[in-house]
Amino acid sequence: MLLSSRSLTNNILQKILSKRFRILLTGDPDGVPPWLGAIEASDEPGLFLPDEAPWIAHADLATMVGGIRALLMQALHPGSLTGVRTHSRYKNDPLGRLSGTIRWLTVTTFASTASVSAEADRVNRMHAHVKGKYTTASGKSIDYSAADPHLLRWVHIAFMDSFLRCHQIYSTRPLPGGADAYIRLWSKSVTPLGLDDAPMSEAEMLSEVARYRPELAVTEETREVIRWIKNPPLPAAALPAYSFLFQAALASLPRDYQDMIGLGHPPLHVLRPFTVKLLKLIRLAIGPESPIEEAAIVRLHRAGIMEEGKVTQRQK
């Protein structure tokens, strides 16, 4: 009876923590992702399957570290930085902006092709209004648009490189096909956004990262956004874990990026084992269930792509 009571208490606590965690990520007062319906909708397959690299990477909590890392990378490019500062609600509604980014990533990874297309249309409509001027690293003022393939490619590379690196460093789950498979498959995610020349291998991605390096710069505006990324207005209970994950994200960046950011050089060899344990602890606290994954898998069973939990058909 004692064990049963303890088990019941643990389950209740886990449900409470899981709800609070999902409220934080989705902005929904009930912790139900508003885009869950898009994941469930239709009897069609999506871009990815449960045994493919993008699905496995984005279902892993290491994406929390990767997301922070991607924001730091994007802040170093004057174009993407200006878009965030001028058109984003990151200051007035930080959780709303976070949930918007999570929505695109989640729908694109787990939803049907029809839902992915609808989500891309939503993002493209927003991008159509994001226009202005920014000052390059060389001091030249130029026009920009969020739909500009050059800036869109940088944002894509920053997310892709960050999710990949943080999965390699902080996750214990191997990626089927390795880095090349993740990059090649995830390139499909940005085709509906108008980017049809994304990197298709790790070598191509690293070459692109190096090509953008001369365009990166640090200004007072950069420092302002980095300070916000380091100290976002999150609930007090979430701040200790977030601060640790921020250090883990910073530690995963190349040394020259760390130098530009100017917040020191956290020791990766020290942070890595503790970050792996922290992510496992968070998973234990919120429980192994994922409403998003479960809905996607149910849809794939309806579509005849899966049977009894296993992939039985491959997409062309």
Predicted segments with their positions:
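Mature, function-bearing regions of proteins
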Residues: 1-154, 158-316
